[in-house]
Amino acid sequence: MIANSRCIACILSKQERKIRKNSDEQKKKEYIHKVLKILYEYGTKECAPMVEKRIKDIYKEYYEEDVDYAALKHRYNQYMLEKEEEIRAHIQKNNDIETCIKYVCAGNYIDFGLANKIDDQLLQGLLDKVNELKISKKEVAYLEDELAQAKTLLYITDNCGEIVLDKIFIEELQNKYKNLQITAMVRGGIASNDATMEDAEEIGLTNVVPVIGNGAAIMGTVKEQLSEEAKEKIQNAEVIIAKGMGNFESMYQEEMNPYYLLLCKCELYKETFGVEMFQPIFCKEERL
């Protein structure tokens, strides 16, 4: 999906906030001009995650990384691992896929690519009130029918922390669909707080299903940047589940037709999908 005007404005605003505390005004102006050039050249023909990757490369020329994502990722991986058994018990009590989907959407709140920081109280509130989240029961039924007939599922993860919920969901799918071969795909390199192979290993996902990197350090799944292995997995998967905004922005209208699972975290998505802030978005592309 090509970045629209509001995405472009959001990207620019994030970059200005990112460098605001730097004291060298001339350096800041030069950097912002470089950002504007990238937005002008690529903002009308590429998705937001790809544009942000180009900006990230320019940022490295001017500044050292100002966020220790390794520490943040470890913190939220451990934060969610501590809640794993409680969440698993709640899912098993409800004994349905719908509850799993609500949890993985709630966990999508853990997104440093969009927010400057995570409100732990808000995150806990989303997890505590997961039964109050609304998703389409009809869409759940569609997914269940497809999984019952499919032999292969590709599950594309998004952020750290929430990958623990992805693991629980995948295990529930394994229990329900015994003949379903599931592969998980993570980012191929560091991209904000997105989950990589290191995160998959830390939270135990690699002990549950085969996990592959997508070949790119981008906050999404950009077809042209994927490894041949990742392209092959996408092409051959009978069902694809794609988590998060970055995957939606990079996969929509790219002939992959996944089920999108994410949390509404911005006004554009609120208006586009007709949902309230911090409510789940769950749908298959062909029915959007």
How should these model regions be labeled?
Residues 160-178, 182-183:
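Histidine-anchored nucleotide/phosphate-binding helix
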Residues 182-199:
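Short connector loops at secondary-structure junctions
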